[in-house]
Curated annotation (Swiss-Prot):
An example molecular function term from Gene Ontology annotations: pyridoxal phosphate binding
Cofactor: pyridoxal 5'-phosphate
KW Transferase (keyword) present: yes
Record's protein name: Histidinol-phosphate aminotransferase
EC number: 2.6.1.9
Length: 386
């Protein structure tokens, strides 16, 4: 039952809607929102405190609305991480990659426009579309959650979207998106029509790389394609591998033209001076912030192998291929809500998300994963027998 008074003039299309959000519960083992479970090192915390202390006397003034120093830090980091050096005017920061995505929908969506995704996909995308009055269409992935590129190309030709939005690694499945698939879709976007737009206007391709630091070593990033493809935008975040979710910092890598479009719709002074200072401090310690990524990859691979050894109703569990810090598993859970509830009773919070029959768990500390494994073995037997 909604708590919103009926006499408030809420938009008609929002009546009955609920705020988005994964459960935030005080439980011993939180494995539901794909955070890095390891806290920042003390040296990182000290540098954050130092940077914030330095700018504190200036908080009576608005921050640098173009956040030039931070955009340079994005450039330096991507040059190391992806091997591609971008100019400052090819980068843009925001309060988490959620705000980046909303800005893209504000700039390139709107009434009469359509965005195209591929399901299963991140559950916030249709909400960005709703909030910007943008149409939302889907091309369906293969049974193993890999992208069906032919279906995407057919949908681009049919729908004539202004944006094509794909996630690599995909959320909630973790499925990597091969570079050759990205390049095929880019080629289609560079000649496709956009419904309601003039001649010579073509859709942009947005690749959401929120989890890309967890990819297998040696796998290239879509950032490497930006210099040759002005219709490509790549979204990144510091919330996942960078262990910086509480700071809410995301960023966009794209051509100057796309960045300038986003700048039109951004709120003035949208990144606070405190946020900018904290992010700069984190980049000073990038190696420390990312030091646990390899261990989390190893945890993912070990957990995937273990899950495949488990059974539910005499069938082995399925595990989707993952290049992220989480695993989608199960495949045939006929009572996934019951499994979720029983795990929660044992202090383990995971996520009911994705297609029916599946659950998602993100990688925690070694101790947290041991608790998860022990609880899951017990819970599967209980739910089977119920």
């Amino acid at each position: 039952m909604s708590s919103i008074p009926a006499n408030l003039p809420l938009r008609n299309d929002l009546i009955g809607e609920e705020p988005y959000g994964a459960p935030q519960l005080d439980v011993p083992v939180c494995l539901n929102v794909n955070e890095n479970p390891y806290a920042p090192d003390p040296a990182v915390c000290d540098t954050i405190a130092k940077r914030v202390r330095e700018i504190a006397p200036t908080l009576n003034r608005y921050p640098d609305r173009e956040h030039i120093e931070l955009r340079q830090a994005f450039s330096d980091y991507l040059a190391r991480e992806s091997g591609t050096r971008l100019d400052v005017d090819e980068l843009w920061g925001a309060n988490g990659s959620n705000e980046i995505m909303l800005q893209l929908f504000q700039a390139f969506g709107g009434p009469g426009r359509t965005a195209l995704g591929a399901d299963p996909t991140y559950s916030m995308y249709p909400e960005y579309a709703r909030d910007t009055f943008t149409g939302w269409k889907l091309a369906h992935r293969n049974a193993d959650f890999t992208l069906n590129v032919d279906k995407v190309l057919e949908a681009i030709a049919e729908v004539k979207p202004s944006m094509v939005l794909l996630t690599s690694p995909n959320n909630p499945t973790g499925t990597p998106l091969p570079m050759e698939d990205i390049e095929r879709i880019l080629a289609a976007c560079e000649t496709a029509e956009v419904v309601g737009a003039g001649e010579g206007v073509h859709p942009i391709l947005v690749i959401d790389e929120a989890y890309v630091e967890f990819r297998k070593p040696g796998t290239p990033s879509a950032v490497s394609l930006i210099k040759d493809h002005p219709n490509l935008a790549v979204s990144r975040t510091m919330s996942k591998a960078f262990a910086f979710a509480g700071a809410r910092v995301g960023y966009l890598a794209a051509s100057k033209g796309i960045i300038d479009c986003v700048r039109i719709v951004r709120m003035p002074y949208h990144l606070s001076a405190v946020t900018q200072a904290a992010a700069l401090a984190a980049f000073e310690h990038a190696d420390e912030q990312l030091s646990r990524v390899e261990h989390l990859r190893e945890t993912r691979e070990a957990t995937a192998a273990w899950l495949k050894e488990q059974t539910y109703k005499d069938q082995p569990l399925e595990v989707a291929e993952s290049g992220s810090n989480f695993l989608l598993f199960g495949g045939h859970f006929d009572k996934r809500e019951a499994i979720f509830d029983e795990l929660l009773k044992r202090g383990v919070l995971i996520r009911v998300v994705g297609p029916d029959g599946w659950l998602r768990v993100c990688m925690g500390t070694d101790e947290e994963m041991e608790t998860f494994r022990n609880a899951l073995v017990e819970v599967l037997r209980i739910v089977e027998a119920a």
